[in-house]
């Protein structure tokens, strides 16, 4: 059933506002009073990336009075395929600055509050406290759990979305009326178990599909209309073009919103998720690939050094652990393709003639160094001694050795 509106009654709309929002005002569920609530509402968007982009545009168009944006990242060229608020001219700028400009282009009457810092346990409660609804567009597990716990402690709902490849999920987590994120996902996946969009890819337009649903849910919560996705998990398969709603329930044993909560203050979420401390980002940038931050734990060779070694009479064997789609974008000439999965199941050491000799020097590479570091660790455990990971992966090779190839 509908819940009480979260946005307070606002001041009367002037003539220009009525003209701008007339199609909202014509809706009986919104009307003049509802639009007045929206112009007074405050919504925080965590992450100005794939999901945050359409969300920010439609929140602005809807006339949300104040929109907060949390993101510590800068715009990169690879963002432009799906993060539609950013343009070519914005590459290198703070995402919060680019986002604020995009919101202003859509609706100059909206106030934008920028937080160009990583959302963490030290600042989350202070930032979230002033907003009616939190829209979670983050791309990493530590921040998802952080946003959830902060919202539970503050008694606020948060509208959550997630995308990967062709699949999306949306729900409204609100402990006062249903489950929180931890009720349904009590434990984070092991580090590296879930590939990032940077590793596995994502259909750009999927961001619009999921982000738009998040905005619709946000508006419903602000106005107290319709049936919000509290207690339901909406699952979208863009390839099959299906939307399924799954019932999810509150967990009485939930450590943060259950009958006897053990989490009564924010914790170290990087540690909770078993990942190294994040380095910037929407709320802490998601590593480009699993294990990226652990590259320093294995022997590493630089791209320029590798290029020099390849020009000698005794060049090392270069192994590429990426998949064929990634190799089609950028590659090191002569690299032997042996997928990381073959290192994980041991077949790399038994089924590939190239690795039959354990005396030849081997350099393993991937995109930026995370997957290759894992492969090197597995090879060392299997008895290989003269093996190293290419620091920075093929992207370092492109930057430092062969800039004719594209970055991705």
What are these regions (language model features)?
Residues 1-44, 78, 266-288:
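N-terminal charged helix/coil linker that caps or initiates catalytic domains
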Residues 46-47, 70, 365:
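Conserved N-terminal Rossmann-fold NAD(P)-binding element of oxidoreductases
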Residues 61-66, 383-385:
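Conserved S-adenosyl-L-methionine
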Residues 3-6, 80, 101, 240-252, ...:
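Rhodanese-like catalytic fold shared by cysteine-dependent sulfurtransferases
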Residues 2-5, 107-121, 125-213, 223, ...:
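E1/E1-like adenylate-forming module used to activate ubiquitin-like modifiers
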Residues 4-12, 66-107:
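Glycine-rich phosphate-binding loop and adjoining beta1-alpha1-beta2 segment
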């Amino acid at each position: 059933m509908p819940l009480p509106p979260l946005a307070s009654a606002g001041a009367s709309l002037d003539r220009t506002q009525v003209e701008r929002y007339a199609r909202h005002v014509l809706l009986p569920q919104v009307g003049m009073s509802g639009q007045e609530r929206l112009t007074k509402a405050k919504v925080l968007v965590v992450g100005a990336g794939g999901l945050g982009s359409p969300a920010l545009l439609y929140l602005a168009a809807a006339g949300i009075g104040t929109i907060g944006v949390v993101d510590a990242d800068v715009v990169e060229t690879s963002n432009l395929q799906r993060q539609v608020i950013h343009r070519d001219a914005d590459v290198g700028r703070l995402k919060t600055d680019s986002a604020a400009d995009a919101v202003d282009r859509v609706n100059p009457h909206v106030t934008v509050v920028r937080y160009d810092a990583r959302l963490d346990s030290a600042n989350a409660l202070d930032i979230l406290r002033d907003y009616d609804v939190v829209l979670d567009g983050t791309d990493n597990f530590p921040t998802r759990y952080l946003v959830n716990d902060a919202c539970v402690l503050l008694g606020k709902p948060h509208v959550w979305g997630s995308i990967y490849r062709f699949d999306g999920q949306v729900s409204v987590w609100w402990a006062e009326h249903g489950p929180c994120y931890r009720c349904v996902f009590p434990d984070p996946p092991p580090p590296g178990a879930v590939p990032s969009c940077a590793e596995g890819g994502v259909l750009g337009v999927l961001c619009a599909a999921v982000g738009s649903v998040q905005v619709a849910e946000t508006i419903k919560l602000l106005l107290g209309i319709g049936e919000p996705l509290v207690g339901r998990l909406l699952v979208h398969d863009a390839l099959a073009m299906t939307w399924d709603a799954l019932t999810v329930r509150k967990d009485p044993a939930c450590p943060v919103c259950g009958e006897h909560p053990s989490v009564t203050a924010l914790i170290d979420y990087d540690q909770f998720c078993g990942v190294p401390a994040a380095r910037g980002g929407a709320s802490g940038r998601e590593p480009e690939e699993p294990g990226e931050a652990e590259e320093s734990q294995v022997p590493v060779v630089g791209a320029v050094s590798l290029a020099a070694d390849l020009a000698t009479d005794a060049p090392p064997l270069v192994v590429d652990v990426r998949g064929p789609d990634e190799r089609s974008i950028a590659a090191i000439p002569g690299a032997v393709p042996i997928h990381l999965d073959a290192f994980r199941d041991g077949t790399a050491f038994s089924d590939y003639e190239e690795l039959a000799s354990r005396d030849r020097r081997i350099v393993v590479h991937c995109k930026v160094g995370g997957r290759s570091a894992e492969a090197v660790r597995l090879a060392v455990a299997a008895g290989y001694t003269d093996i190293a990971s290419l620091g920075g992966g093929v992207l370092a090779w492109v930057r430092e050795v062969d800039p004719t190839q594209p970055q991705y």
